[in-house]
């Protein structure tokens, strides 16, 4: 009997172990399957991502076919493509847009540049160029934009016919660029007002001369107009009236003084003919 009891006990223990295993499977099985599924899913995503990356970097579909430019006037597409080392067949996904913009921005005529990838196989480049409005003597001859920025040296191929701003030197500009640009902007403002109020091509502006406390203009005919300081718009309107009066009398002026500080309304004129000179006339 003792042997029979021992055998029954072993059977009971085995049955209990099987039941325990079944219970563990019932309780832990779904969780284990979930973990396994997540592991497999993550693996598939990683593999799929790597495969997708490989495809995007090697597929002919994303090879550069065309580059379009807008805003070009002085700069050329050939120059910009060379600066950026941008060539047909490059993969669009590998292009560094910021690096392309920095490279193209080295061109002296460019004020701003924006590069955009147009998938699957194009790139567009939008540029804004400096607008040349004058030239300045700063040791060498530089081109000025409308902000008074000397953005490039004048080269023979520029083909510019612009007023010349003189009276500043390179040392002064380097020592205080902000103050120098402010003076250049004031000269450009006077040049712009002159062009608007004196459309006569015979008296086209040739030079704006910056002096210590004053400003003078020189025209293409060699006439000098001394504006002094301040009230440039009013003085230029007065200049137009003086020229009309001189023209009506058949006279031409060599120098016109509009810089009388004590009597701002007075105009002194040196007539071109040495035989006659008219000065001190009030032209209010």
From Swiss-Prot:
Ranges in the topological domain labelled Cytoplasmic: 1-34
Residue intervals of the POTRA domain: 62-130
Region (Disordered): 1-23
Residues annotated as transmembrane: 35-52
GO BP field: cell septum assembly; FtsZ-dependent cytokinesis
One matching Pfam family: FtsQ_DivIB_C
UniProt keyword Cell division, yes or no: yes
Main location: membrane
Function noted in UniProt: Essential cell division protein.
Protein's recorded name: Cell division protein FtsQ
